[in-house]
Amino acid sequence: MSFVLQLPRQAVLILLLVFFGAMCTSSLIPVMGFFIVEGLGQQPWQIALYSGIVAPLTIVVNRLLGERLDRMVAVKPLLLISIIAYLLMALLLSSLPPFWLLVAVGAPVMAVANGATSTEFTYGRLYAERHGIEITQYNAWLRMGVSLAWVVGPAMSFITIDLVGFRVAYMISAGLAGIWFVLWHLAVPNDFRAPQRPPRPVELDGIDWWLLLAALVCTLIAIGNVLFTAAMPLFFVREVGLPGYTPGLAISAKCVVEVIAIFSAARLAERFGPRAVLAGAAILAILTFAAFAQVSSVLQVVILGAIEGYYYGLFAGVAISFVQSYAPDKPGRATALFMNSLYLGGFIGNVSMGFIADAFSFQAVIYVAAASGVPVLLALAVLRPPRST
């Protein structure tokens, strides 16, 4: 907390910008599948049609925004595009559109809105560099803001939907864009852009393989996390026979500990290095997911949920700085690549979960999630430390 108290006003505004931006998008993203099935009356498999458009388009959007930030395009107009896209998406959803319109128009618009997170993280990194703020700790606070937002946003939407319906919930989400816009106006100077940097030679015709391998580590961790998160509710309730509220308790325990772990991750990275922290997170994930596959009581779920929060908090606290360290001269590209690695991991995890569960069981999905930590350790063993700059 003393770190934040010592930050200049602008740095604190950036933290608030990231928090409210994440709260806005998190009020839409986790509800979408529920909305497609319950709100629009579609079949569950049709969720994949929407997700199959949003995920790859988000990857493209993040790449384009990252390249423009590295080419010294001002941050403010790029971020405004994503905020406007979010507002349009929330208004579209509040109209309860036909499914074809959601897929044809809503999915591309949501992909543009998703680009806000990458842009904000790049802006935070650039601001920290310019003002001599310790980057690893500041990134950890940015990531903690996202984690806190995801505690608030989804819960707010689901409770509102349960009480008054989808239309009101999405109108509230649209209203949140007003706060996001005010923070955008206050936190981002009109002419803020990346500094000009000397070109750094890369290997093998411009392909930075070490940067890609660093991003692959994040993709593999994201695959395991999404495999578990997607299968966990049905495994607990259907296969283990635990009460319906059990998944919510697990998520709550995870989120609380995750925030604490993000604080400690930066200090551990300073002492042992980010690769060691990520390796520790992967080992903890393997053990935790394997234990989850054998739970038989709510108490066990809550305890393991807290441990899961610690592993994911370690990852969340250092991952973005870890990837950025392999491209210090191109923070926009590195940040976009990091965000895309998470979206790619989420896409692979969500699709794979359905096939594995259909062929075997939801318990098998959780075992696969545990096994996904092994290639993380192998990739970290191969990956060399970043070049000093």
Spans of model-derived segments:
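Helix-to-loop junctions at the C-terminal end of transmembrane segments
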Residues: 60-74, 161, 261-273, 357
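Hydrophobic core of transmembrane alpha-helices in multi-pass small-molecule transporters
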Residues: 19, 100-116, 219, 300-314
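Cytoplasmic helix-loop-helix junction between adjacent transmembrane helices
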Residues: 109-144
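Transmembrane alpha-helical segments of major facilitator superfamily
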Residues: 50-58, 146, 249-258, 341-342
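A late C-terminal transmembrane helix in Major Facilitator Superfamily
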Residues: 329-359
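Helix-loop boundary and gating motifs at the non-cytosolic
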Residues: 3-55, 222, 226-239
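Structural signature of the two symmetry-related core transmembrane helices
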Residues: 77-91, 174, 276-290, 370
